[in-house]
Amino acid sequence: MTTRIDTRFAELKKQGRSAFVTFVMAGDPDLATSLQVLKALPAAGADIIEIGMPFTDPMADGPAIQAAGLRALHSGATLSHTLGLVRDFRKDDDTTPMVLMGYYNPIYIYGVDAFLADAKAAGVDGLIIVDLPPEEDSELCLPAMKAGLNFIRLATPTTDEKRLPAVLANTSGFVYYVSITGITGSASADSAAVGDAVARIKRHTDLPVCVGFGIRTPEAARAIAAEADGAVVGSALIDALQKSLDADNRATKATVGAVADLVASLAAGVRGAKQAAE
């Protein structure tokens, strides 16, 4: 099974560059604007798109992404709406990989089998579920793989050599390395430490390793992209979106452009990095 994610990384490897992975929250600040933002991302330079599934208790997320989730929930966004956004995006773009990221509870309530069928039909390529450890693989990971979706696992600075094989066992698509301990948007990533961590993970897997948390500038994106197969940016994009909203947290004429302009700037940073020697 070759997914859009596999195809995209193969293309990027031929080009000798790393992936630029963007994260935005579904339904932030409303569904119509959210779709416009999603459609603007590939043209601005996003290689892979992660879409946050709004949830009431996002324990791993920092203030920016928590606020984005609340704006989305207040606008009425549900998991069904999130899948609808992917479906609408796919009407114009059948190549950019789309990964849903979030927590298990909304999927459990939706129903695992129904969710996987609907996600696949909508055009979702992979899942990142931050609160399902490998010990729970039978809940969602294995059924997702059977449905043809990549299940992307998080590794962290505290994932030691003993734990890493379990983390990687049923991972596919790519490995998401969380470069700092703590919540999203909280600190800056250290590219030297990231390089060591990526090398350690790659001793255990042939999968691409993407690095997220703590990347906010083109310079930081370039430094991380030189060490990894991809750089993931979320909080900085959500900050840019939030700053473009009016006093009532409604979208303005500047909202889509504010996100797209930052994506273009960060993408230029990623493209300026030389892929680390294999």
From Swiss-Prot:
Pathway: Amino-acid biosynthesis; L-tryptophan biosynthesis; L-tryptophan from chorismate: step 5/5. Keywords: Amino-acid biosynthesis, Aromatic amino acid biosynthesis, Lyase, Tryptophan biosynthesis. The active site is at 50 (proton acceptor), 61 (proton acceptor). Its EC number is 4.2.1.20. It holds the Pfam family Trp_syntA. InterPro entries: Aldolase_TIM (IPR013785), RibuloseP-bd_barrel (IPR011060), Trp_synthase_alpha_AS (IPR018204), Trp_synthase_suA (IPR002028). SUPFAM superfamilies: Ribulose-phoshate binding barrel. GO terms for molecular function: tryptophan synthase activity. GO terms for cellular component: cytosol. It catalyses: (1S,2R)-1-C-(indol-3-yl)glycerol 3-phosphate + L-serine = D-glyceraldehyde 3-phosphate + L-tryptophan + H2O. CDD domains: Tryptophan_synthase_alpha. It is an enzyme of class 4 (lyase). Gene3D superfamilies: Aldolase class I. Tetramer of two alpha and two beta chains. Belongs to the TrpA family. The alpha subunit is responsible for the aldol cleavage of indoleglycerol phosphate to indole and glyceraldehyde 3-phosphate. This is Tryptophan synthase alpha chain. The gene is trpA.
